[in-house]
Curated annotation (Swiss-Prot):
Gene responsible for this protein: uup
Keyword tags: ATP-binding, Coiled coil, Cytoplasm, DNA damage, DNA repair, DNA-binding, Hydrolase, Nucleotide-binding, Repeat
Means of activity regulation: ATPase activity inhibited by N-ethylmaleimide but not by vanadate.
Listed GO CC annotations: cytoplasm; plasma membrane
One term of GO molecular function: ribosome binding
Gene3D superfamilies to which the protein is assigned, alphabetical: P-loop containing nucleotide triphosphate hydrolases, Valyl-tRNA synthetase, C-terminal domain
UniProt cross-references to InterPro entries, sorted A to Z: AAA+_ATPase, ABC_tran_C, ABC_tran_Xtn, ABC_transporter-like_ATP-bd, ABC_transporter-like_CS, ABCF_ATPase, P-loop_NTPase, Uup
EC numbers: 3.6.1.-
Catalytic activity line of the entry: ATP + H2O = ADP + phosphate + H(+)
Protein name: ATP-binding protein Uup
Length: 635
């Protein structure tokens, strides 16, 4: 029997139902990704599965005593109390006892007075009476598993830690089904990697909504597509779903075209002259009326946005030039000795954990902050368009149209006037939706409105700070195409690995302590170069340490068991090892430079060949030293 079965589900808040006679079956130990366009009803379906929202019609059957928990789309904000208090509330009615026990236990540790000890004894009796010790242990296990400090104030946590706390709150109820709505939103790449690993160890079923294509590929065992009120299951991985979905839409288009052709024929027949009307078949007339109804009820596939950037005249060739830039805040080094040159047309991603200094570096480059030391040169003729969903101001009480055009009927697009409603339709806002207050928009619609407003501004430098949150896959792909065709310079902050892969030519990775590594290519290219550089340095460091120890040992010990010639060779080997290691390290530094792989192929191959030869020479010298040492010691 399925854990959850939904039959004939119907739900509507407007003319077009969110669920139209939908069917869904959820099995044990699977990871189901729910996909669909913005506004299709995915989050509403999650609420239905979590018993927060009812159906207009249809039924849902749950396995007996099934526990379902939901991680909401937005992390908790402005919540008072400790992490323990927040997580414990996932157990609902027993939470108050457990929170009181946690608070009084901390109090006793600092003040073991008789009054506090008596209070602790009372609370312990309540836990005994309600048999809550097992729940207390479960909360502590979940907190330890997530690396959460139970005593920290929830309000002090960053977005990633808030997301972990919310996940802990969902997990303490020990659910068989875990519902995750956009779990990667606002998380940095390191935390997303951690989340993937953690969720793969979850003993139960996961149903999740995500527009992070890398996350979907790594997690999903089945795809469920919500499209125009219908739920369609696609077994297998995400790439297989994309192929099958494309084919299904192609077949639907052909079927609709054939239906429309037949309908047009019947309309011609019904409009024929008196002779035709005398002889016409009443059954055929009824069939025509049914066809008209079917055509009128058809829900068309949601269109694709038509984004277009308003490009300004070209900037100077050098957009930014930085030399030994340093910047720190409250003793924390965010940027240290960073040097780089950004040329016109470069597309660069800034990658690193939340709070590492990505936005700070952008502000330094734009002159909004002053560097502690170093030099930043800003190029000429720059026209900047800056997208930052966290700082962008939208009036929630004004309509979509008024937020964009401030009461005007036209906007200027590429130097030509265009009606506001027509421009908004390019961003998938139908005229009726354009009259809606912003507070009623979904996260994806809000971001589309911000992009629509941004792209009205002429620019030759596009700065995008987390532009992908809440956008559906189709809009993401269009934004990728837009960035690819943009003639100006792009600086991008994003935690969407595939989006970075598809849009940039260089990555700046924040590696800790203010160090920023520059690497050619997209995210996975950059990570590969970074790992290669680390792997190359480790053997060299080990050889240096061993050679230094060997040098000291050679001076210290006698050499009575070696001939004069071999003894001289042994004494000279430590210095040779140091020289070879220095040579290898110099070559490795060349390879690690961000511009290395952009050089002509012949040059890079020569350096790589020299590096391989130096590694072999170092290995042979080290083996010779080991042999002579063993010989000297009678080995």
């Amino acid at each position: 029997m399925s854990l959850i079965s939904m039959h004939g589900a119907w739900l509507s808040f407007s003319d077009a139902p969110l669920l139209d006679n939908a069917e869904l079956h959820i099995e044990d130990n699977e990871r189901v990704c729910l996909v669909g366009r913005n506004g299709a009803g995915k989050s509403t379906l999650m609420k239905i599965l979590n018993r927060e929202q009812g159906l207009d019609d249809g039924r849902i059957i749950y396995e007996q005593d099934l526990i379902v928990a939901r991680l909401q789309q937005d992390p908790p904000r402005n919540v008072e109390g400790s992490v323990y208090d927040f997580v414990a509330e996932g157990i609902e009615e027993q939470a108050e006892y457990l929170k009181r026990y946690h608070d009084i236990s901390r109090l006793v540790m600092n003040d073991p007075s008789e009054k506090n000890l008596n209070e602790l004894a009372k609370v312990q009796e309540q836990l005994d009476h309600h048999n809550l010790w097992q729940l207390e242990n479960r909360i502590n296990e979940v907190l330890a598993q997530l690396g959460l400090d139970p005593n920290v104030a929830l309000s002090s946590l960053s977005g990633g830690w808030l997301r972990k706390a919310a996940l802990g709150r969902a997990l303490v109820s020990n659910p068989r089904v875990l519902l995750l709505d956009e779990p990667t939103n606002h998380l940095d790449i390191e935390t997303i990697d951690w989340l993937e690993g953690f969720l793969k160890t979850f003993n139960g079923t996961i149903i999740f909504i995500s527009h992070d294509r890398s996350f979907i590929r790594n997690m999903a065992t089945r795809i469920v597509d919500l499209d125009r009120g219908k739920l369609v299951t696609y077994p297998g991985n995400y790439d297989q779903y994309l192929l099958e979905k494309e084919e299904a839409l192609r077949v639907e288009e052909l079927q609709n075209a054939e239906f429309d052709r037949k309908l047009a024929q019947e309309e011609v027949w019904i409009r024929q002259g008196i002779k035709a009307r005398r002889t016409r078949n009443e059954g055929r007339v009824r069939a025509l009326k049914a066809m008209r109804r079917e055509r009128g009820e058809r829900r068309e596939v949601m269109g694709t946005a038509k984004m277009q950037v308003e490009e300004a005249s070209r900037s100077g060739k050098i957009v930014f030039e930085m030399e030994d830039v340093c910047y720190q805040v409250n003793g924390k080094q965010l940027v240290k000795d960073f040097s780089a040159q950004v040329l016109r047309g470069d597309k660069i991603a800034l990658i690193g954990p939340n709070g590492c200094g990505k936005t700070t570096l952008l502000k330094l480059m734009l002159g909004q902050l002053q560097a502690d030391s170093g030099r930043i040169h800003v190029g000429t003729k720059l026209e900047v368009a800056y997208f930052d969903q966290h700082r962008a101001e939208l009036d929630p009480d004004k309509t979509v149209m008024d937020n964009l055009a401030e009461g005007k009927q036209e906007v200027m697009v590429n130097g030509k006037p265009r009606h506001v409603l027509g421009y908004l339709q390019d961003f998938l806002f139908h005229p009726k939706r354009a009259m809606t207050p912003v507070r009623a928009l979904s996260g994806g619609e809000r971001n589309r409105l911000l992009l629509a407003r941004l792209f009205l501004k002429p620019s030759n430098l596009l700065i995008l700070d987390e532009p992908t949150n809440d956008l559906d896959v189709e809009t993401l792909e269009l934004l990728e195409e837009l960035i690819d065709s943009y003639q100006g310079t792009v600086l991008l902050v994003s935690h969407d690995r595939q989006f970075v892969d598809n849009t940039v030519t260089e990555c700046w990775i924040f590696e800790g302590g203010g160090k920023i590594g520059r690497y050619v290519g997209g995210y996975h290219d950059a990570r590969g170069q970074q790992e290669q550089y680390v792997a190359l340095k480790q053997p060299a460091v080990k050889k240096t340490e061993e050679a230094a120890a060997a040098k000291a040992e050679t001076v210290k010990r006698s050499s009575s068991k070696l001939s004069y010639k071999l003894q001289r060779e042994l004494e000279q080997l430590p210095q040779l090892l140091e020289d070879l290691e220095a040579k290898l390290e110099a070559l490795q530094t060349q390879v690690a430079d961000a511009s290395f792989f952009s050089q002509p192929h012949e040059q890079t191959q020569k350096v790589l060949a020299d590096m391989a030869a130096a590694e072999q020479e170092l290995e042979q010298a080290f083996e010779r030293w080991e042999y002579l040492e063993a010989l000297k010691n009678g080995g």
